[in-house]
From Swiss-Prot:
The keyword Transferase applies. Its EC number is 2.3.1.275. It is an enzyme of class 2 (transferase). It holds the Pfam family G3P_acyltransf. Catalyzes the transfer of an acyl group from acyl-phosphate (acyl-PO(4)) to glycerol-3-phosphate (G3P) to form lysophosphatidic acid (LPA). This enzyme utilizes acyl-phosphate as fatty acyl donor, but not acyl-CoA or acyl-ACP. Pathway: Lipid metabolism; phospholipid metabolism. GO terms for biological process: phospholipid biosynthetic process. One of its GO terms (cellular component) is plasma membrane. This is Glycerol-3-phosphate acyltransferase. It comes from Methylobacillus flagellatus (strain ATCC 51484 / DSM 6875 / VKM B-1610 / KT). It catalyses: an acyl phosphate + sn-glycerol 3-phosphate = a 1-acyl-sn-glycero-3-phosphate + phosphate.
Amino acid sequence: MNNAVFVIAAYLLGSISFGILVSKAFGLPDPRTVGSGNPGATNVLRSGKKLAALLTLLGDAAKGWLPVWLAQYYALPVGVVCWVAVAVFLGHLYPVFYRFKGGKGVATALGVLLAFSPLLAGLALLSWIVVFALTRFSSLAALTAAALAPGFAWLLLPQIGYIIVVFVLSLLLIWRHRSNIRKLLDGSEAGFGKKS
């Protein structure tokens, strides 16, 4: 497969919103119209359907993992693998199928990290779990994991290109949480289980 086609395919895969599709399949409201307005697993969970949230999480993570893993499996150049990783993540943030209005990228970023290194993904996930357990703020948990991920990548990944990608994904994820950052600072952010 042509490298450019691989990158484009990764973007299109990233543009598929499992939060929207799963919610529709379960007869739930469009997650963009309720709660935080984010079509991610945490907001789908606010509907009360744990299975729907789990499927959203797995779908969004899998679409981040699959194209990167395939690019590595077919021994594409590291530079191409990096572009594939960025493309699938941008597809989730700015999906062509939903007028370029997507999610915040937490699960998809985790999928990319998993393809790079299971240990890296595990450390990022552990960071999220610890902060969420202590604070009940999924946004703060995501921001903490994003802030720590480049450091983990620096220690674990041998390819500088992959480290740069993790840094870029972390910056984009933090940027997508800018409204949450403002709410955290002024005390108006709703913890999980409370209305946004």
